[in-house]
Amino acid sequence: LLTLAVLLMVSADMAFAGFGCPGDQYECNRHCRSIGCRAGYCDAVTLWLRCTCTGCSGKK
């Protein structure tokens, strides 16, 4: 189970802490979308303190 959690954390693109977390997951989602990612959420693994972006296209 711990291995799965670590793999999920490594595979997701992490934004900086904050951006609405904790408390405003919509702000986190807006932030992630504004930087070119598909979505964002407050990550439970970090006790909802970090905004995690998913589906990012990568830096060019």
From Swiss-Prot:
Tissue: Expressed in hemocytes.
Subcellular location(s) per record: Secreted; Target cell membrane
Pfam families named in the record: Defensin_2 (PF01097)
Keyword Membrane belongs to the record: yes
This protein's record includes keyword Membrane: yes
Biological process (GO), any one: innate immune response
Signal peptide limits: 1-17
GO CC list: extracellular region; membrane; other organism cell membrane
Cysteines engaged in disulfide bonds, as pairs: 21-42, 28-51, 32-53, 37-56
Binding residue positions for beta-D-GlcNAc-(1->4)-Mur2Ac(oyl-L-Ala-gamma-D-Glu-L-Lys-D-Ala-D-Ala)-di-trans,octa-cis-undecaprenyl diphosphate: 19-21, 31, 51
UniProt keywords, alphabetically: Antibiotic, Antimicrobial, Defensin, Disulfide bond, Immunity, Innate immunity, Lipid-binding, Membrane, Secreted, Signal, Target cell membrane, Target membrane
Induction annotation: After a bacterial challenge, the level of transcripts decreases dramatically in the circulating hemocytes. This decrease can be correlated with an increase of transcripts in the gill and the mantle tissue, suggesting a possible migration of the hemocytes expressing Cg-defh2 towards the tissues implicated in the first defense barrier of the oyster.
Chief location: secreted
Annotated spans, Binds to membrane interface: 22-25, 43-49
PROSITE patterns in UniProt: INVERT_DEFENSINS
A GO MF label: lipid binding
InterPro entries: Defensin_invertebrate/fungal, Scorpion_toxin-like_sf
Homology family: Belongs to the invertebrate defensin family.
Role noted for this protein: Antibacterial peptide mostly active against Gram-positive bacteria. It acts by selectively inhibiting peptidoglycan biosynthesis through complex formation with the cell wall precursor lipid II (1:1 molar ratio) thus inhibiting cell wall synthesis. It does not disrupt cell membranes. Is noticeably more potent than Cg-Defh1.
Record's comment describing the protein's domains: Has the structural arrangement of an alpha-helix connected to a beta-sheet by disulfide bonds (CSalpha/beta).
Protein name: Hemocyte defensin Cg-Defh2
